[in-house]
Amino acid sequence: MLTTDHLDDVIAGLSFLKKLPHVDANRIAIAGHSFGGQLTLLAAERDSSVRAAVTFGAAAGSWEDWPELRERLLSAVRKTSAPLMLIHASNDYSTAPGNAMAAERKRMGKPRVLKIYPAIGKTSEEGHNFVYSAVDRWETDVFKFLDANVR
């Protein structure tokens, strides 16, 4: 995860979007879930034109067991200038990643929003995947965040 082609693919996708005539290259946000949330943070760090980044359950399943990943993602949230919205359900595998990254951004005085929603379903897996099953819970908050930071 720390050095993979996946991030290069995301960056290539962003570059492609910027070339499309109907895309305002100055108003691009990026979002991702789980591993995609990790890539979202790394892409926002690498591409300074990203205006906002939203993560759902980023690193929730690997934060405690992978110190290199923790430090890499904390480094990314330190370096990116894009406002971050970090989202978990309270019954995600772990909410520690969002809490730690939001605390780091706060310490640095950088824009961030941390949202921990009430438990979705009964299991950690259901909590982790609420991005798909409970859009009505998060969509208003995410669109307000994007309106405030990308418009």
Please annotate each region the language model reported.
Residues M1-P21:
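Alpha/beta-hydrolase active-site loop
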Residues H22-S34:
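Alpha/beta-hydrolase fold nucleophile elbow
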Residues P111-R151:
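C-terminal catalytic histidine-bearing segment of alpha/beta-hydrolase fold enzymes
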Residues T80, L86-H88:
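Short beta-strand/loop motif that positions the catalytic acidic residue
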Residues G32-L42:
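Glycine-rich nucleophile elbow surrounding the catalytic serine of serine-hydrolase chemistry
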Residues L42-R51:
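Conserved hydrolase catalytic core segment
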Residues Y93-N99:
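Conserved alpha/beta-hydrolase "acid-adjacent" motif
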